[in-house]
Amino acid sequence: LQHLTTGSALVDQFGKAGNYRGRNLGDVFEEQAKIWNENAELAIRFPFYLRMVTRKVKINKENVTDKSQSGQGARDESFKRLLWVAKNHPNDFYNNIFILPLVGSWKDIWTIMFYDKKFNVNAIEKNILFDVLSNGLQSETHVDLVKKFMPRIKSSSKCTTDWTKETNALAKDFSKFLGISYKEYNKLKASGKAHDFQKIICARKYDELEWKKIPGRDLHLLVNGKFLSNHNLTDSYTSWIIEQPTAKFTGYVFELSKRLREKGLVGGGYNKVTLPIEVKHTLDAQFDQLVKTALEGGKITENVLCCLDTSGSMGSRVSGLKNVSCCDIATSLALFFAKINKGAFHNVIMRFDNTCYPVTLTSESFCECTEQLPHCACGGTNFQGVIDEIVKIRKEKPQIPLKDYPTTIVAVSDMQFNDCGWGGAKATNYDIAKDKLLEVFPKEFVDKIRFIWWDVSSRYGTNGFESKSTDDGSMFISGFDGSIMTLLLGEENVVDEKSGETRRPTAEDLVKKALSQEILNYVQLADKK
């Protein structure tokens, strides 16, 4: 059994956000309206959370967020929801839109204006957004990135797509807004210093490249292609990367895993592959950067047991992504969670399908651990096998102290669970798991155990939820960025607003915490400013 809703539209949508890709505009508008009616203050923040790239956010030269801010990096869904705000609550849109390039990219301002025309919403007053861009040009912190994403003005004959046609027209309008000619506008764009490495490459001055200044995604592409070998740069790059504890990367862990799969390295040790040393060190260093960034957002102080679904349905593709399976997402997230967890289960993953057994990672190398991970796509999805294994250990080895057992259980799965066949027709996996644990553990210990249900967004879609929004021991979440876990699991007890008593956070509390991160606190309803 699963619940059709947690009882809160916002908690439902927060949990399912990882499934939101390329949706119909009407569906997005309907859902944004629903959460606005439930809680407008959090609803205005939700699109910015969806867009946010996990990192410390630079507001200006003097102000940077204290911790890494965690989001979903979901551009399309974020822009469509913001269009709803622009259409229905324009004051709230214009008062907060300056946050968008801070949590995302300066390209986002151009993209949302393009969306406004593409979907015939026609709600945006472009001069107000031009003013945001103009302010960015005057900021020492942001000026070069603003210039980087300004569309170059071209002749109409060279604009052959809807994007180039519309952004070319917008660029011309922006040049008029700035009071400069088209030629001066293009010269202004070219004066930007962001990504100087591209200019060096275009000038064929390869010896002048400074590897540490190349952005993470670009570095990833250069190293995994033929660029280094074609220009005799392999030795130069290798001598640099092997000395780096981390390397820039703001993507998702599964993108690193996908690169390994493309090179023939898969989990389970089925295919032994020797990676070029520069590739291995780059992937390891970029993974370590993702772990470091996540830990800068908070520390996990609990014993977290990560459970990896390796059932047959995990071989299905992820909704909205080409050549990416649920297994790709799940194994990369499981590895990530095992590394950011510093408790008793650091480097431990519990796999489950028809059966269940633990896998202990014996290396700190991302590439080597990926090879160790079990291969997915076999058998059913028996999550209760994890609980049965914990109960079995407790019965057979009662001398193991409670402090060595998990206090949080994370299930990384497509949520296509087997019928439990235990606990009655109205029992969820969450309910059944608690009942089983109560047979061998003290109630006060079981009451402290939390379950995190991480949906890897299969094409089958999510059937429902394992618990309600007001339950304090369960949370449903989805997506590709696992860094939010350090925020959610770093939560201390909260004081109940009604009773004044201290209690554990519910799913509603955790969603509110995610939407109250430092940068999102700048987002306010117009009538509250």
Model region roles, listed by residue range:
Residues 1-329, 339-529:
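Long lumenal/extracellular ectodomains of secretory and single-pass membrane proteins
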